[in-house]
A protein has these predicted regions:
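Secretory/periplasmic and organellar redox-cofactor proteins
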Residues: 84-97
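Local sequence-structure signature of Cys/Sec-based thiol-disulfide redox active-site neighborhoods
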Residues: 1-25
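A short, hydrophobic beta-strand/beta-hairpin element that forms part of a small beta-sheet core
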Residues: 53-63
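Non-catalytic, surface beta->alpha helical segment in thiol-disulfide oxidoreductase systems
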Residues: 61-87
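Generic recognition of short, well-ordered alpha-helical segments
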Residues: 17-21, 47-48, 68
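Thiol-based oxidoreductase modules, predominantly thioredoxin-like and allied folds used
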Residues: 32-43, 50
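A generic structural signal for alpha->beta connector loops
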Residues: 4, 29-33
């Protein structure tokens, strides 16, 4: 399964735009599923994140809030990709035993 990145953002938010630029740049070089969620699309989502955008989740784990560091984001995504590959290899080895 591909690594999932969910970005909770709001239009007109400078930090959100900066975060999406970093995430998009990394996405060009690394395979992961990216879902950009506008917090104004749902009242529930808006209530949860209106005071903390951008909020970035990697594989369901809150990884960044307000500021996304490009190097740290790259490391975290790379680590999740490696873990997924190891799980795939391990499951294949178990199938052949």
């Amino acid at each position: 399964m591909k690594t999932r990145v969910e970005a909770y953002v709001k239009e007109g938010c400078a930090l959100c735009e900066e975060a999406m630029e970093i995430i998009s740049s990394v996405h060009e070089d690394m395979p992961f599923n990216l879902k950009k969620i506008d917090i104004t699309s749902s009242e529930d989502i808006f209530r949860r994140y209106h005071a903390s955008v951008p909020t970035i989740f990697i594989n369901g784990v809150k990884s960044f809030k307000f500021k996304v560091d490009g190097e740290e984001f790259t490391k975290k995504v790379r680590m999740e990709i490696i873990k997924a590959k190891v799980r795939r290899i391990s499951s294949k080895k178990l199938q052949y035993k």
